[in-house]
Amino acid sequence: MDDTTSAAPEPDRLRLLRVLGPAHVWALGVGIVLVGEYMGWNFSVGKGGMIAGLMACWVAGLLYTCVAMIDSEVTSTVAAAGGQYAQAKHIVGPLMAFNVGLFLVMAYTMLEAANAITVGFLLDTVAGMQGQTGLNQQPFIVLAIMFLAWLNYRGVLATLTFNLVITAIAFLAIVALFVSVQFGASAVPLDFSAITSDPLPYGWVGIVASLHFGLWYYLGIEGTCQAAEEVRSPARSLPYGTMAGIMTLLIAATMTWYICSGLMPWEYLGQAGTPLFDAARVTGSTGLMVLLFVGTAFATLASANGCINDASRAWFSMSRDRYLPSWFGAVHPVYRTPYRAIVFLVPIALIFALGAPLDQVVTFSILSGLLGYTFMTFNMVMFRNKWPLGRIKRGYVHPFHPLPTVVLLILCSTAYFAVFLGYGTQLSAMMCFYIVASLWFHFRRYKFVRRGDQFTMPWPKPHGY
C-alpha cells in the first residue's frame, strides 16, 4: 500500500457530501460526550470526594469552554475534514499535523472501545437484576461496534440523524431524573451531609487527582470540527453547533453531579460502573429505572457512533494527503463515505474493547485528547499572528484572546499532573508510542507527502512572509 510510484495527474476525486446542518453538528459533539455523564466522571469522586468531584466538573468545563471557543474560530475558517489535523497542516507544519491526526484517531477509537465495554457492562447489570448472572458481554460489544460501523458506512446524514434522536432522548432522561428527584419522586431523599462531614477525604491533592476523570464530562466536544467538509455552511453551523453543545454539556454535567452525589454515598459513587442508572435504581421508581437504562444505552451508542465518524474522517484526511497510505483515502461511489477508513479502524476498536480494562482505555483516550488540546494553544497563537483579524474572513471570532489560550494551557498542564498521579506508567508508555510514530513519519513516510498540495485554503500569505 506504499505510494512508491511517482505522482501522476489524477482525475477529480469523489468528495464527501455537504448535507449537515447545525443540529447535526450539535448531535455529533454532544452525542460523543454525553456518555461521560452516564459513566466515567464518577471516578473523580473516588479520587477526591464529593467537593473534589464538583470542582473537577467545573474546572474541566472551563477547559472545554476554551477548547470550544478556540476550535470554533479556526474550524469556521479551515473547513476541511480532519478538523484539528487540517488546522495543523495549514498553520504549523507536517510533523505536527501527523501527530495531531494520530491523537484524534486514538482518542476517538479508544473512546469507541470504552463505550462498547459500557454497553456490555450495562446489559450484564440488568441481567443480574433479573437473576441471570454471568452474562457473556463480548457478543454485545462486537454487535454494537459492527452495527454502528455499518451505519457509518452507509451515509453520514442517516448516521448523524440517528445520533440526533438518541442523543436528545439521553439528555432528556437526565433532565427527567433531575426534575423527578426535585419533586419528591425518589424513595431516598437527597443527602449532602458528606460535604460538611468529610469534604476533602484526600486533601487538596484529591482535587488535582480528580481532574483526570472530570475531563470525561466533556471529552470529545472538539469532534464537531470533523464534520467541517460535510456541513452545508461551515462558517455558521460549526460555531453554533459547538457552542450550543458545550452549554448543553455544562448543564447536564452539573445536574448529573447533583443527583448522583445526593442519592449515593461518595464511597460507592466513586467506583460505580453506571452511576446515573444506579441513581435511578436508588429512587425506587421503575419508570425512572427504565428511562435511565434507555438513556445510558442511547448515550453509549451515540458516543460510539460519533467516534467512528470522527476517527474515520481523521484517518481518511491523513491518507488523502499521503501522510498514511493513500488507499485509505477513498470515498465510496454510492454512499460518499470514507468507507475504507471506517472498515480499517473496526478491528482496532474491537481489540481494545475485548482485551483492555475500562480505566486503561479511558486513560488512553483522555491523554490523546489532552495532547490535542495542548496543540490548540500554540495553533491559536500562530493563527492569530500569521493571519490577524481582518486579513481573512472568519465565521466566528472568539473573545478575550489570548486569555482562553493561556487558561487552556495552564489547565492542560494541571491535567497532565493529575493523570501522572494515578497513571504515570500509562502516560510514559503513550508518550513513547507517539515519539516512535513521529520518527516513523519523519524517516519513512514524509517522502511520499506531496509538499505542494498541503496548503489548500484560499488565504493570502502569512503576515511577515
Swiss-Prot record:
Belongs to the amino acid-polyamine-organocation (APC) superfamily. It is a multi-pass membrane protein. The keyword Membrane applies. Coiled coil: none annotated. Probable amino-acid or metabolite transport protein. The chain crosses the membrane at residues 19-39, 50-70, 91-111, 140-160, 164-184, 201-221, 244-264, 288-308, 342-362, 363-383, 403-423. GO terms for biological process: transmembrane transport. Keywords: Cell membrane, Membrane, Transmembrane, Transmembrane helix, Transport. It is found in: Cell membrane. Its main location: membrane. GO terms for cellular component: plasma membrane. Signal peptide: none annotated. The keyword Transport applies. This is Uncharacterized transporter R00093. It holds the Pfam family AA_permease.
